[in-house]
C-alpha cells in the first residue's frame, strides 16, 4: 500500500476516493459491494467445510478427547486477533508519519475487529480451561496478559470516542495503537517468560510435531477460514468507518458554511446601519 496525497485516499476494496477533508465523496457509498458479497459467500462455504473437518472428519485426541475440537476455533481466532493488533500498530505508525486519513481509518477498523477476536479468545480460553484445568479462570500469565491486551484495545476504541476534533482524536488513538503489537509479543512469550498452565508451542512445531496429520490439516484450514472471516469484517468495518468520516466532515463543512453566512449577514447589517446613520 502506497501513500496517497492528502486529498485522495484509496478504499480498502481498491476504489479511489477523496479524503473527508474536502471535495465530494466518490468512495464507498455503502458497507458492502459485489466483491464483499462474493467474499461472504466463499467465507460461508469455507466455514461450513471447516466445521465439518473440525467436528466430524478430525479424530479425537488421545488425552483430551473431544475437548480438542475447541482447538480448531481457538487457535485461528487467536491468530487473527494478533493480525488485527499488528495491522492497527502499523497503520497507527503510518498515520503519525503520513497524516493520511486512509491509515487512520484502517487502524480504527482493524482495532475493532481485533477487539472482537480477542474477546472471543478469552471466552474460548475459559471454556477450554473448565474441562482441562477444572476452573473457568485462573490468573495464569497467558490469560492475564490476553485480558490486558483486550483492555488496551478497549482503551483504543474509547479514545476514538472522546469528543474532540478529528486530528486530535486520530493522533491520540494512534499513540495507543503503537502499544498493541508489543503487547501481542508479551502475550505470545508469556508461557516462556513466566510459570504458566498454558501449553507452549507444541502443536505445529516442525521439528517435533505433536498433532495428527488430519488434525493439523483441519487446524491449518480453519486458520484460513478465520482469515476469510477477518477480511470480510475488516473490509465492512473499513467502509463503515470511511462513511462515518464523510458524514462528520460533511457536518463540519455545513456548520462552517452556516457560520460564514451568519458572519456575512451580520457584517452586511452593520454596514447598512453605519451607512444609514451617516446619511
Provide a role label for each language-model segment.
Residues 2-279:
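Polytopic transmembrane helical bundles with strong interfacial aromatic enrichment
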Amino acid at each position: 500500500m502506497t501513500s496517497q496525497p492528502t486529498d485522495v485516499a484509496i478504499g480498502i476494496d481498491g476504489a479511489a476516493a477523496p479524503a473527508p477533508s474536502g471535495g465530494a465523496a466518490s468512495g464507498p457509498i455503502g458497507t458492502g459491494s459485489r466483491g464483499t458479497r462474493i467474499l461472504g459467500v466463499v467465507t460461508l462455504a469455507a466455514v461450513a467445510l471447516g466445521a465439518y473437518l473440525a467436528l466430524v472428519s478430525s479424530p479425537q485426541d488421545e488425552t483430551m478427547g473431544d475437548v480438542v475440537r475447541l482447538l480448531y476455533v481457538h487457535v485461528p481466532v487467536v491468530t487473527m486477533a494478533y493480525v488485527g493488533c499488528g495491522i492497527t500498530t502499523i497503520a497507527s505508525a503510518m498515520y503519525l508519519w503520513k497524516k493520511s486519513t486512509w491509515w487512520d481509518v484502517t487502524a480504527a477498523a482493524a482495532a475493532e475487529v481485533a477487539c472482537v477476536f480477542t474477546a472471543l479468545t478469552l471466552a474460548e480460553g475459559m471454556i477450554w480451561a473448565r474441562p482441562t484445568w477444572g476452573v473457568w479462570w485462573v490468573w495464569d500469565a497467558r490469560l492475564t496478559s490476553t485480558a490486558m491486551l483486550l483492555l488496551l484495545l478497549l482503551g483504543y476504541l474509547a479514545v476514538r470516542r472522546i469528543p474532540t476534533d478529528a486530528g486530535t482524536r486520530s493522533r491520540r488513538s494512534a499513540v495507543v495503537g503503537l502499544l498493541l503489537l508489543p503487547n501481542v509479543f508479551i502475550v505470545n512469550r508469556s508461557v516462556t517468560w513466566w510459570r504458566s498452565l498454558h501449553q507452549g508451542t507444541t502443536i505445529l512445531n516442525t521439528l517435533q510435531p505433536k498433532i495428527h496429520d488430519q488434525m493439523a490439516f483441519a487446524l491449518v484450514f480453519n486458520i484460513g477460514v478465520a482469515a476469510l472471516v477477518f477480511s470480510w469484517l475488516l473490509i465492512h468495518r473499513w467502509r463503515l468507518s470511511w462513511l462515518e468520516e464523510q458524514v462528520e466532515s460533511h457536518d463540519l463543512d455545513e456548520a462552517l458554511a452556516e457560520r460564514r453566512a451568519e458572519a456575512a449577514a451580520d457584517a452586511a447589517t452593520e454596514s447598512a446601519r453605519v451607512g444609514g446613520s451617516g446619511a
